[in-house]
């Protein structure tokens, strides 16, 4: 009887332990189920409200942008400042080149150069402009004008030589004077001259007065004591030598009336000119 009682107590203790373990496992399972269910509900709630998530993302982006914006502005300001310095340096070099050229062409004491600079802000692409003004005094201008006039001043000697080179036979006339017209017609009507006679009208020449004065003073075989006013055109040159030195009557008209003008012209031709008498038909 006593043995049966001890066995019964032992069996009852085992059942109690089994129940406790089973209950513990059940509670643990329920707790795990509730935990998994809560996580799924939280993820569904977050996915069901995208506007709020988007708003939060935008706020975070704005915070990051505000944080980085000062650094970007500082970098842009530094870049534009460097570009301003480069532009200003280029303009300064160009102005130096212009001033050096002005100093070469114009005497320094007679010129004044002022430079004005105006710059725009970096918002308008950092445009830097330069204005250079050069002022010349009247004395400098007159000297420059006189220099140009002297450079283009008429040289009668050079002009005379250029005309003589056009032909071995050259006749200088004045179309308003009878002696000039008479000699021109005489040579063209009665004489064959080759190369062709070159005729220069001093009244139509742009510097006829200076050219005639040079001929009278330097190219005629006359007495140096003779007055230049008494010498009149025409002036005939064969091979650069003057034929008329004592006047039209003594050097042209008298020899022509005696039949001596052709030999006179041939003697001055010296083989460089062909001078022949033309066959003039008689009136009979």
Swiss-Prot record:
Entry protein name: Pheromone-regulated membrane protein 4
Membrane topology: Single-pass membrane protein
Domain Glutaredoxin: 157-272
Protein keywords: Membrane, Transmembrane, Transmembrane helix
Keyword Transmembrane helix listed: yes
Transmembrane segments: 20-38
Gene of this entry: PRM4
Superkingdom in the source lineage: Eukaryota
Cellular component GO terms, alphabetical: fungal-type vacuole; membrane
Subcellular location per the Swiss-Prot or TrEMBL entry: Membrane
């Amino acid at each position: 009887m006593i043995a049966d009682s001890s066995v019964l107590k032992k069996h009852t203790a085992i059942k109690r332990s089994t129940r406790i373990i089973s209950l513990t496992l059940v509670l643990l399972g329920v707790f795990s189920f509730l935990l998994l269910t809560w996580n799924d509900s939280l993820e569904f709630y977050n996915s069901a409200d995208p506007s709020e998530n988007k708003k939060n993302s935008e706020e975070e982006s704005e915070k990051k942008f505000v944080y980085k914006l000062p650094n970007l502005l500082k970098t842009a300001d530094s870049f534009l400042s460097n570009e301003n310095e480069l532009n200003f340096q280029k303009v300064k070099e160009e102005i130096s080149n212009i001033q050096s050229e002005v100093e070469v062409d114009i005497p320094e004491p007679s010129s004044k150069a002022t430079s004005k600079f105006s710059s725009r802000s970096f918002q308008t692409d950092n445009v830097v402009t330069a204005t250079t003004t050069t002022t010349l005094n009247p004395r400098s201008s007159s000297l420059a004008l006189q220099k140009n006039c002297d450079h283009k001043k008429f040289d009668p000697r050079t002009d005379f030589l250029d005309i003589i080179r056009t032909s071995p036979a050259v006749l200088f006339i004045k179309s308003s004077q009878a002696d000039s017209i008479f000699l021109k017609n005489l040579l063209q009507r009665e004489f064959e001259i080759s190369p062709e006679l070159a005729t220069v009208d001093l009244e139509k020449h742009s510097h006829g007065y200076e050219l005639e004065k040079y001929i009278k003073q330097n190219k005629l075989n006359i007495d140096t004591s003779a007055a230049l006013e008494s010498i009149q055109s025409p002036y005939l040159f064969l091979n650069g030598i003057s034929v008329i030195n004592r006047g039209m009557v003594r050097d042209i008209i008298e020899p022509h009336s005696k039949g001596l003008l052709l030999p006179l012209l041939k003697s001055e031709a010296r083989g460089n000119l062909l001078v022949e008498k033309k066959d003039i038909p008689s009136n009979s």
